[in-house]
């Protein structure tokens, strides 16, 4: 089973046990030692890739400085706070984020894909969030571009999703707010980032569409189209 939602030992780090070991072997050994140290942990029974982002990062060999945001004090905060920091780690050392160490991947943008809560008789619909400054109140990305360009991405994505849903499946699909709000997944990334609340997972009318594989394809295509518009 998978270790999930369990307080991590303060001393654990994703570093090789031996300099002679390949990195992949070291990560496997560290992960096995962690599980052995948590013999009484409750396991989720789920594949690692659908557990919390915090645990996916840990068992993928991402440095603990990325995923252990609260120094093992709060898994919930670690989970959402680490996602934008992980984006910065991926882009670190590239033209997109040249001033931080990382994997050198020149990312164009970041998407945090969520469903929302809320119940009503009709469709709850789609909300999207961006943030015009980061934790240090910077209003520009490392590239020099204004962070307000994240609003363009948010507008493209929300518009495309709502228009496609209305045209193909649900003329009543609701376009909710486009918010400049301080959420970690919109605020932390050093590339244009949006947080999408596609629909309400509590609302039967929304989930009638959310469980339809045809709708899922349409939504995925709409997101893809919006990224292309933004990049070009």
Language model segments and positions:
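Catalytic-core regions of hydrolytic enzymes
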Residues: 1-124
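Second-shell loop/turn segments in exported
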Residues: 35-44, 69-77, 98, 139-148, ...
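Metal-dependent peptidase/peptidase-like ectodomains
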Residues: 43-57, 112, 124-158
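Glycine-rich, acidic and aromatic/proline-enriched surface loops and short helix-turn segments
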Residues: 51-63, 159-163, 187-192
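Solvent-exposed, polar/charged alpha-helical surfaces in well-ordered, non-transmembrane soluble domains
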Residues: 51-55, 85, 89, 151, ...
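Short regulatory "switch" loops immediately downstream of catalytic or recognition motifs
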Residues: 61-63, 88-95, 129-136, 162-167
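Active-site-adjacent mobile loop/cap segments within catalytic or ligand-binding domains
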Residues: 110-139, 168-232
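Active-site-adjacent substrate-binding region
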Residues: 146-179, 187
């Amino acid at each position: 089973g998978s270790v999930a939602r369990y307080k991590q030992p303060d001393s654990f780090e994703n570093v090789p046990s031996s300099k002679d070991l390949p990195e992949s072997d070291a990560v496997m050994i560290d992960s096995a030692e962690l599980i052995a140290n948590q013999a009484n942990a409750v396991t989720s029974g789920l594949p690692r890739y659908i557990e919390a982002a915090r645990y996916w990062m840990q068992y993928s060999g991402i440095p603990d400085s990325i995923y252990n945001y609260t120094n093992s004090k709060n898994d919930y905060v670690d989970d959402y706070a680490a996602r934008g920091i992980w984006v910065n780690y991926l882009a670190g050392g590239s033209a997109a984020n040249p001033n931080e160490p990382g994997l050198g991947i020149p990312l164009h943008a970041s998407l945090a894909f969520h469903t929302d809560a809320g119940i009503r008789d009709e469709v709850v619909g789609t909300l999207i969030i961006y943030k015009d400054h980061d934790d240090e109140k910077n209003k520009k990305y490392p590239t020099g571009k204004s962070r307000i360009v994240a609003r363009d991405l948010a507008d493209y994505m929300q518009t495309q999703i709502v228009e496609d849903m209305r045209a193909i499946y649900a003329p009543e699909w609701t376009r909710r707010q486009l918010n400049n709000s301080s959420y970690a997944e919109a605020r932390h990334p050093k590339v244009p980032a949006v947080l999408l609340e596609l629909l309400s997972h509590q609302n039967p009318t929304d989930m009638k569409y959310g469980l339809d594989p045809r709708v899922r394809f349409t939504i995925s295509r709409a997101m893809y189209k919006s990224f292309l518009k933004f990049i070009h």
